[in-house]
Amino acid sequence: MSDIEAKIRSAWIGRISGCQLGKPIERMSMRDGHSALHDYLSDVGPLPLRDYVGYKEGYDIQKECCRGFLSRSEPDDDINYSFLALLMLEEHGRDLSTSDVARTWLKRLPAAQTFTAERAAYKVLLERGKEWFPETGNAGFDLSACSDNPYNDWIGAQIRADVYGWVCPGNPELAASLVTEDASLSHRGDGVYGAVFVAVLGALLMTHTPAEALRTAKTYLPENSGAIIAVELAESLLA
């Protein structure tokens, strides 16, 4: 196994296991807030977490994703986008366009598995797109309307981004180009910048040290953007 293949395998494992780690309590954190989440985690196991989340009766969490009950990777909307990215790259390669992403969503992505910016973009595609757009031709309207939504600077496009980096080892420019086509369907500004950062970082980590990859990936973010501020804040917390 080559070094790059080993890194890609590890990236897949990290992607899926990380998703499963947070999945049981995802709704709790959004519904009940940080304090309730912290209390639950403190009750079922020591913090900081060093294993999957434990299960306790009486809480509305996904038992099948908890420590002691895991038998597989449970379906998740975040992982769906990783597979969609692979499908689109297999079909379109370097020529992937935002229109291709829109068609793929309509043909392969259940509407009920979209949320926030993606749901808003999907709704516009259904309402304004030509009936036969998923099969051929143009959408019949300017696709930039899909990203005109209240969530377009949220992290959804970042969640969709990592595969574009993995398949471009040592080629951050191509990774940035591909992920921009995908991200632009539903996001703008920092929503796209964050996705570019994730994809570029993934491409660079295949051939560079983590420190080198991070340093170079930051150069793809506009100065004073929310994305660069967030990255530098994270760095400061590690200092």
What is each model feature region?
Residues 1-239:
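Structured, active/binding-site neighborhoods that engage oxygen-rich ligands
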